[in-house]
Protein backbone atom coordinates (compact mmCIF):
# COMPACT_ATOMS: atom_id res chain seq x y z
CA UNK A 1 0.00 0.00 0.00
CA UNK A 2 1.33 3.46 -0.90
CA UNK A 3 1.29 6.17 1.72
CA UNK A 4 -1.03 8.97 0.55
CA UNK A 5 -1.86 12.06 2.58
CA UNK A 6 -4.95 12.85 0.51
CA UNK A 7 -7.40 9.98 0.92
CA UNK A 8 -10.65 10.32 2.88
CA UNK A 9 -11.94 8.07 5.67
CA UNK A 10 -15.47 6.93 6.47
CA UNK A 11 -17.11 4.07 8.36
CA UNK A 12 -16.21 0.44 8.80
CA UNK A 13 -18.96 -2.03 7.98
CA UNK A 14 -18.45 -5.40 9.59
CA UNK A 15 -15.53 -5.58 11.99
CA UNK A 16 -16.00 -5.41 15.75
CA UNK A 17 -14.12 -2.17 16.46
CA UNK A 18 -13.46 1.07 14.57
CA UNK A 19 -12.53 4.69 15.10
CA UNK A 20 -15.70 5.86 13.35
CA UNK A 21 -19.14 6.47 14.82
CA UNK A 22 -21.99 6.03 12.36
CA UNK A 23 -25.33 7.29 13.66
CA UNK A 24 -28.57 6.07 12.03
CA UNK A 25 -30.84 8.84 10.73
CA UNK A 26 -34.61 8.87 10.41
CA UNK A 27 -34.23 7.73 6.80
CA UNK A 28 -32.80 4.35 7.88
CA UNK A 29 -35.05 1.58 6.56
CA UNK A 30 -37.00 -0.28 9.25
CA UNK A 31 -37.85 -3.49 7.39
CA UNK A 32 -35.69 -5.55 9.74
CA UNK A 33 -33.57 -7.20 7.05
CA UNK A 34 -32.06 -6.61 3.63
CA UNK A 35 -29.80 -8.26 1.03
CA UNK A 36 -26.81 -6.91 -0.89
CA UNK A 37 -25.73 -8.55 -4.15
CA UNK A 38 -22.16 -8.09 -5.26
CA UNK A 39 -21.54 -6.32 -8.53
CA UNK A 40 -19.12 -7.37 -11.27
CA UNK A 41 -16.63 -4.81 -12.55
CA UNK A 42 -16.56 -5.04 -16.34
CA UNK A 43 -13.08 -3.66 -17.05
CA UNK A 44 -10.26 -4.46 -14.66
CA UNK A 45 -6.58 -5.18 -14.44
CA UNK A 46 -5.84 -8.31 -12.48
CA UNK A 47 -2.81 -8.31 -10.23
CA UNK A 48 0.19 -10.56 -10.54
CA UNK A 49 -0.51 -13.35 -7.98
CA UNK A 50 2.33 -12.55 -5.53
CA UNK A 51 1.00 -9.01 -5.21
CA UNK A 52 -2.36 -10.33 -4.01
CA UNK A 53 -0.51 -12.53 -1.49
CA UNK A 54 1.44 -9.46 -0.37
CA UNK A 55 -1.83 -7.65 0.30
CA UNK A 56 -3.25 -10.45 2.41
CA UNK A 57 -0.09 -10.89 4.46
CA UNK A 58 0.46 -7.21 5.14
CA UNK A 59 -3.19 -6.69 6.06
CA UNK A 60 -2.90 -9.24 8.86
CA UNK A 61 0.60 -8.12 9.90
CA UNK A 62 2.23 -11.40 8.85
CA UNK A 63 5.92 -11.76 7.94
CA UNK A 64 6.52 -11.47 4.20
CA UNK A 65 8.42 -14.24 2.37
CA UNK A 66 11.81 -12.90 1.24
CA UNK A 67 10.80 -12.77 -2.43
CA UNK A 68 7.56 -10.92 -1.72
CA UNK A 69 9.29 -8.57 0.71
CA UNK A 70 12.03 -7.82 -1.81
CA UNK A 71 9.52 -7.07 -4.56
CA UNK A 72 7.46 -4.80 -2.30
CA UNK A 73 10.55 -2.80 -1.32
CA UNK A 74 11.84 -2.29 -4.84
CA UNK A 75 8.55 -1.92 -6.66
CA UNK A 76 9.71 -3.17 -10.08
CA UNK A 77 7.78 -6.36 -10.62
CA UNK A 78 4.64 -5.11 -8.89
CA UNK A 79 4.57 -2.09 -11.16
CA UNK A 80 4.51 -4.09 -14.39
CA UNK A 81 3.25 -7.48 -13.21
CA UNK A 82 -0.38 -7.11 -14.28
CA UNK A 83 -2.28 -8.48 -17.24
CA UNK A 84 -5.62 -7.66 -18.82
CA UNK A 85 -8.14 -10.40 -17.99
CA UNK A 86 -11.83 -11.15 -18.13
CA UNK A 87 -13.60 -9.81 -15.03
CA UNK A 88 -14.28 -13.08 -13.25
CA UNK A 89 -11.02 -14.88 -13.96
CA UNK A 90 -9.55 -14.73 -10.48
CA UNK A 91 -12.66 -13.93 -8.41
CA UNK A 92 -11.07 -10.78 -7.00
CA UNK A 93 -13.18 -8.01 -8.54
CA UNK A 94 -16.67 -8.46 -7.08
CA UNK A 95 -17.66 -5.37 -5.17
CA UNK A 96 -20.63 -3.55 -3.67
CA UNK A 97 -21.97 -0.11 -4.51
CA UNK A 98 -22.11 2.59 -1.86
CA UNK A 99 -23.10 6.25 -2.11
CA UNK A 100 -21.19 8.89 -0.17
CA UNK A 101 -22.79 12.29 -0.59
CA UNK A 102 -23.69 12.30 -4.29
CA UNK A 103 -20.91 9.96 -5.42
CA UNK A 104 -21.38 6.24 -6.07
CA UNK A 105 -18.28 4.18 -5.31
CA UNK A 106 -17.29 0.52 -5.27
CA UNK A 107 -16.29 -1.02 -1.94
CA UNK A 108 -15.39 -4.46 -0.65
CA UNK A 109 -17.44 -5.56 2.37
CA UNK A 110 -14.75 -6.82 4.70
CA UNK A 111 -15.04 -8.81 7.94
CA UNK A 112 -11.29 -8.69 8.50
CA UNK A 113 -10.67 -4.96 8.76
CA UNK A 114 -11.54 -2.14 11.11
CA UNK A 115 -10.88 0.64 8.62
CA UNK A 116 -12.81 1.92 5.60
CA UNK A 117 -11.34 4.62 3.41
CA UNK A 118 -12.02 5.76 -0.14
CA UNK A 119 -10.29 7.51 -3.03
CA UNK A 120 -11.15 11.20 -3.19
CA UNK A 121 -10.66 14.25 -5.39
CA UNK A 122 -7.91 15.33 -2.98
CA UNK A 123 -5.60 12.70 -4.46
CA UNK A 124 -3.14 13.71 -7.19
CA UNK A 125 -4.73 13.32 -10.63
CA UNK A 126 -2.52 10.34 -11.50
CA UNK A 127 -3.71 8.45 -8.40
CA UNK A 128 -7.37 9.03 -9.31
CA UNK A 129 -7.13 7.16 -12.61
CA UNK A 130 -9.22 3.98 -12.95
CA UNK A 131 -11.04 4.73 -9.68
CA UNK A 132 -14.44 6.11 -8.82
CA UNK A 133 -13.81 9.22 -6.78
CA UNK A 134 -15.56 10.83 -3.81
CA UNK A 135 -15.79 14.64 -4.01
CA UNK A 136 -15.84 15.89 -0.41
CA UNK A 137 -15.80 19.53 -1.51
CA UNK A 138 -19.33 19.12 -2.92
CA UNK A 139 -21.21 17.52 -0.03
CA UNK A 140 -18.80 16.89 2.84
CA UNK A 141 -18.05 18.92 5.95
CA UNK A 142 -14.35 18.95 6.76
CA UNK A 143 -13.42 18.50 10.41
CA UNK A 144 -10.70 21.03 11.22
CA UNK A 145 -7.41 19.64 12.49
CA UNK A 146 -8.72 16.06 12.14
CA UNK A 147 -6.72 13.50 10.15
CA UNK A 148 -6.69 9.70 9.95
CA UNK A 149 -3.91 7.23 9.34
CA UNK A 150 -3.63 3.47 9.00
CA UNK A 151 -0.52 1.30 8.73
CA UNK A 152 0.17 -2.26 7.62
CA UNK A 153 2.54 -4.96 8.70
CA UNK A 154 5.17 -4.14 6.09
CA UNK A 155 5.51 -0.56 7.31
CA UNK A 156 3.43 1.07 4.57
CA UNK A 157 0.07 2.74 5.01
CA UNK A 158 -2.35 5.48 4.01
CA UNK A 159 -3.59 8.71 5.56
CA UNK A 160 -5.88 11.61 4.83
CA UNK A 161 -8.36 14.25 5.92
CA UNK A 162 -11.64 13.60 7.74
CA UNK A 163 -15.06 14.71 6.48
CA UNK A 164 -18.67 14.28 7.60
CA UNK A 165 -21.14 13.12 4.95
CA UNK A 166 -24.10 10.82 4.36
CA UNK A 167 -23.35 7.18 3.56
CA UNK A 168 -25.97 5.05 1.77
CA UNK A 169 -25.77 1.27 1.34
CA UNK A 170 -28.68 -0.70 -0.14
CA UNK A 171 -31.06 2.17 0.64
CA UNK A 172 -29.90 2.47 4.25
CA UNK A 173 -28.55 5.90 5.06
CA UNK A 174 -26.37 6.95 7.97
CA UNK A 175 -24.75 10.22 8.92
CA UNK A 176 -21.12 9.71 9.90
CA UNK A 177 -19.43 11.40 12.84
CA UNK A 178 -15.79 10.63 13.52
CA UNK A 179 -14.37 10.76 17.04
CA UNK A 180 -10.84 9.95 18.23
CA UNK A 181 -11.84 6.91 20.27
CA UNK A 182 -13.32 3.48 19.62
CA UNK A 183 -16.99 3.60 18.64
CA UNK A 184 -19.61 1.32 17.18
CA UNK A 185 -19.30 0.29 13.55
CA UNK A 186 -21.88 0.97 10.85
CA UNK A 187 -23.27 -2.53 11.41
CA UNK A 188 -23.18 -2.10 15.16
CA UNK A 189 -25.46 0.91 14.88
CA UNK A 190 -28.06 -0.69 12.61
CA UNK A 191 -28.26 -3.96 14.59
CA UNK A 192 -31.13 -2.64 16.72
CA UNK A 193 -33.15 -2.12 13.53
CA UNK A 194 -32.63 -5.68 12.33
CA UNK A 195 -34.77 -8.73 13.09
CA UNK A 196 -31.64 -10.48 14.38
CA UNK A 197 -28.12 -9.11 15.06
CA UNK A 198 -26.60 -11.17 12.26
CA UNK A 199 -25.35 -11.00 8.72
CA UNK A 200 -24.45 -13.85 6.38
CA UNK A 201 -21.99 -14.21 3.51
CA UNK A 202 -22.68 -16.41 0.50
CA UNK A 203 -19.79 -15.65 -1.84
CA UNK A 204 -19.54 -17.44 -5.17
CA UNK A 205 -16.92 -18.93 -7.48
CA UNK A 206 -16.78 -16.82 -10.67
CA UNK A 207 -20.15 -15.21 -9.94
CA UNK A 208 -21.49 -12.39 -7.75
CA UNK A 209 -22.34 -13.43 -4.21
CA UNK A 210 -24.71 -12.13 -1.54
CA UNK A 211 -24.66 -10.58 1.91
CA UNK A 212 -27.87 -10.86 3.95
CA UNK A 213 -28.46 -8.67 6.99
CA UNK A 214 -30.86 -9.49 9.82
CA UNK A 215 -31.95 -12.95 8.68
CA UNK A 216 -30.75 -16.37 7.52
CA UNK A 217 -31.91 -17.37 4.04
CA UNK A 218 -32.34 -21.14 4.33
CA UNK A 219 -32.58 -21.47 0.55
CA UNK A 220 -28.88 -20.62 0.30
CA UNK A 221 -27.42 -23.45 2.39
CA UNK A 222 -27.68 -27.21 2.89
CA UNK A 223 -28.39 -28.81 6.27
CA UNK A 224 -28.10 -27.24 9.71
CA UNK A 225 -25.21 -24.80 10.22
CA UNK A 226 -22.48 -25.85 12.65
CA UNK A 227 -21.51 -23.08 15.10
CA UNK A 228 -18.26 -22.09 16.78
CA UNK A 229 -17.75 -19.41 19.47
CA UNK A 230 -15.92 -16.25 18.39
CA UNK A 231 -13.04 -14.59 20.21
CA UNK A 232 -13.47 -10.90 19.35
CA UNK A 233 -10.85 -9.58 21.77
CA UNK A 234 -8.75 -8.35 18.83
CA UNK A 235 -11.69 -7.05 16.83
CA UNK A 236 -11.75 -10.01 14.41
CA UNK A 237 -14.16 -12.83 13.60
CA UNK A 238 -11.71 -15.35 15.05
CA UNK A 239 -12.38 -18.90 16.19
CA UNK A 240 -10.73 -22.31 16.69
CA UNK A 241 -11.26 -25.11 14.17
CA UNK A 242 -10.83 -28.74 15.19
CA UNK A 243 -9.17 -30.33 12.18
CA UNK A 244 -8.63 -30.47 8.43
CA UNK A 245 -8.59 -32.93 5.53
CA UNK A 246 -6.50 -33.00 2.37
CA UNK A 247 -8.09 -35.33 -0.15
CA UNK A 248 -8.63 -38.68 1.62
CA UNK A 249 -6.22 -37.83 4.46
CA UNK A 250 -8.03 -36.87 7.69
CA UNK A 251 -6.45 -34.83 10.50
CA UNK A 252 -9.25 -34.55 13.04
CA UNK A 253 -7.03 -33.67 16.01
CA UNK A 254 -5.15 -30.70 14.53
CA UNK A 255 -6.70 -27.61 16.15
CA UNK A 256 -5.85 -24.14 14.84
CA UNK A 257 -7.13 -20.60 15.22
CA UNK A 258 -8.25 -18.60 12.19
CA UNK A 259 -9.85 -15.30 11.23
CA UNK A 260 -12.70 -15.51 8.71
CA UNK A 261 -12.05 -12.59 6.36
CA UNK A 262 -14.24 -11.69 3.38
CA UNK A 263 -11.66 -9.11 2.32
CA UNK A 264 -8.72 -11.49 1.81
CA UNK A 265 -8.28 -13.65 -1.29
CA UNK A 266 -6.33 -16.65 0.01
CA UNK A 267 -6.47 -19.25 2.72
CA UNK A 268 -3.38 -18.37 4.77
CA UNK A 269 -2.81 -21.54 6.79
CA UNK A 270 -0.20 -23.02 9.14
CA UNK A 271 2.83 -24.24 7.24
CA UNK A 272 2.23 -27.89 8.25
CA UNK A 273 -1.23 -27.84 6.66
CA UNK A 274 0.00 -26.10 3.52
CA UNK A 275 2.88 -28.51 2.98
CA UNK A 276 0.65 -31.54 3.52
CA UNK A 277 -1.85 -30.28 0.95
CA UNK A 278 0.67 -29.57 -1.82
CA UNK A 279 2.65 -32.76 -1.16
CA UNK A 280 -0.10 -34.70 -2.95
CA UNK A 281 0.12 -32.60 -6.14
CA UNK A 282 2.67 -33.74 -8.72
CA UNK A 283 4.93 -30.90 -9.80
CA UNK A 284 4.01 -28.56 -6.95
CA UNK A 285 6.76 -26.55 -5.27
CA UNK A 286 7.33 -23.52 -3.12
CA UNK A 287 8.39 -20.93 -5.70
CA UNK A 288 10.88 -18.61 -4.00
CA UNK A 289 10.86 -16.19 -6.92
CA UNK A 290 7.11 -15.65 -6.61
CA UNK A 291 6.90 -16.14 -2.85
CA UNK A 292 4.32 -18.92 -2.71
CA UNK A 293 3.23 -22.45 -3.60
CA UNK A 294 2.74 -23.15 -7.30
CA UNK A 295 1.88 -26.15 -9.47
CA UNK A 296 1.37 -27.04 -13.16
CA UNK A 297 -1.82 -25.40 -14.39
CA UNK A 298 -3.06 -28.71 -15.82
CA UNK A 299 -2.79 -30.44 -12.43
CA UNK A 300 -5.92 -31.87 -10.82
CA UNK A 301 -6.11 -30.47 -7.31
CA UNK A 302 -7.58 -32.49 -4.43
CA UNK A 303 -10.35 -31.23 -2.20
CA UNK A 304 -9.48 -29.51 1.04
CA UNK A 305 -11.72 -29.43 4.11
CA UNK A 306 -11.76 -27.61 7.44
CA UNK A 307 -13.50 -29.34 10.34
CA UNK A 308 -16.22 -27.38 12.15
CA UNK A 309 -17.27 -29.74 14.93
CA UNK A 310 -18.70 -32.70 12.96
CA UNK A 311 -19.19 -30.69 9.77
CA UNK A 312 -16.47 -30.77 7.10
CA UNK A 313 -16.36 -27.51 5.17
CA UNK A 314 -15.17 -28.84 1.80
CA UNK A 315 -13.34 -26.59 -0.64
CA UNK A 316 -13.27 -27.99 -4.22
CA UNK A 317 -9.83 -28.24 -5.79
CA UNK A 318 -10.79 -25.83 -8.58
CA UNK A 319 -11.26 -23.07 -5.98
CA UNK A 320 -7.64 -23.52 -4.90
CA UNK A 321 -6.27 -23.02 -8.42
CA UNK A 322 -6.19 -19.28 -8.00
CA UNK A 323 -4.34 -17.82 -11.00
CA UNK A 324 -1.88 -18.51 -13.78
CA UNK A 325 1.43 -16.69 -13.47
CA UNK A 326 1.67 -14.56 -16.64
CA UNK A 327 3.91 -16.00 -19.34
CA UNK A 328 4.13 -19.46 -17.78
CA UNK A 329 2.23 -22.74 -17.52
CA UNK A 330 2.46 -22.50 -13.74
CA UNK A 331 -0.44 -21.57 -11.46
CA UNK A 332 -0.45 -19.90 -8.04
CA UNK A 333 -2.26 -21.67 -5.22
CA UNK A 334 -5.18 -20.34 -3.20
CA UNK A 335 -3.64 -21.90 -0.07
CA UNK A 336 -0.45 -20.24 1.16
CA UNK A 337 1.54 -20.60 4.42
CA UNK A 338 1.81 -18.32 7.44
CA UNK A 339 4.09 -18.93 10.40
CA UNK A 340 2.13 -17.04 13.00
CA UNK A 341 -1.34 -17.63 14.46
CA UNK A 342 -4.11 -16.96 13.70
CA UNK A 343 -4.55 -18.31 10.19
CA UNK A 344 -6.80 -16.44 7.73
CA UNK A 345 -9.70 -17.95 5.78
CA UNK A 346 -10.39 -15.74 2.78
CA UNK A 347 -12.17 -16.06 -0.54
CA UNK A 348 -10.68 -19.42 -1.53
CA UNK A 349 -12.50 -20.91 1.47
CA UNK A 350 -15.63 -18.75 1.49
CA UNK A 351 -16.67 -19.38 -2.13
CA UNK A 352 -17.99 -22.83 -1.17
CA UNK A 353 -19.43 -21.97 2.26
CA UNK A 354 -22.47 -20.23 3.71
CA UNK A 355 -21.21 -18.34 6.76
CA UNK A 356 -23.30 -16.78 9.53
CA UNK A 357 -21.79 -13.92 11.54
CA UNK A 358 -23.86 -13.69 14.72
CA UNK A 359 -23.20 -10.87 17.20
CA UNK A 360 -25.30 -12.69 19.79
CA UNK A 361 -22.58 -14.74 21.45
CA UNK A 362 -20.71 -13.84 19.34
CA UNK A 363 -20.48 -16.93 17.16
CA UNK A 364 -20.11 -18.08 13.56
CA UNK A 365 -22.09 -20.74 11.73
CA UNK A 366 -20.91 -22.75 8.72
CA UNK A 367 -22.81 -24.79 6.14
CA UNK A 368 -22.36 -25.88 2.53
CA UNK A 369 -23.84 -23.59 -0.09
CA UNK A 370 -26.90 -24.83 -1.91
Curated annotation (Swiss-Prot):
Glycans are attached at residues 80, 102, 251, 298. It is an enzyme of class 3 (hydrolase). It comes from the Eukaryota. InterPro entries: Aspartic_peptidase_A1, Aspartic_peptidase_AS, Aspergillopepsin-like_cat_dom, PEPTIDASE_A1, Peptidase_aspartic_dom_sf. Residues 1-21 form the signal peptide. The active site is at residues 110, 261. GO terms for biological process: proteolysis. This is Probable aspartic-type endopeptidase ARB_04018.
Amino acid sequence: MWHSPFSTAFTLFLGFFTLTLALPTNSLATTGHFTIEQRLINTIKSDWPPKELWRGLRKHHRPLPPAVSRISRHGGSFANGTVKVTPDEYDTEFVNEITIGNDTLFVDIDTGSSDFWVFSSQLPEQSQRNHRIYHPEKTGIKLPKQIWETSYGDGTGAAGNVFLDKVNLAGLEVSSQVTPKKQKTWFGNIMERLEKPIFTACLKHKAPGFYDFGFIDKTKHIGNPSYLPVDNSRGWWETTFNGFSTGPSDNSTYRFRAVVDTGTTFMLLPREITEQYYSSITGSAFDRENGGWTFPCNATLPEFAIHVNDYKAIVPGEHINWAQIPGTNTCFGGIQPVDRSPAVLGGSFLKSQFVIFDHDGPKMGFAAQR
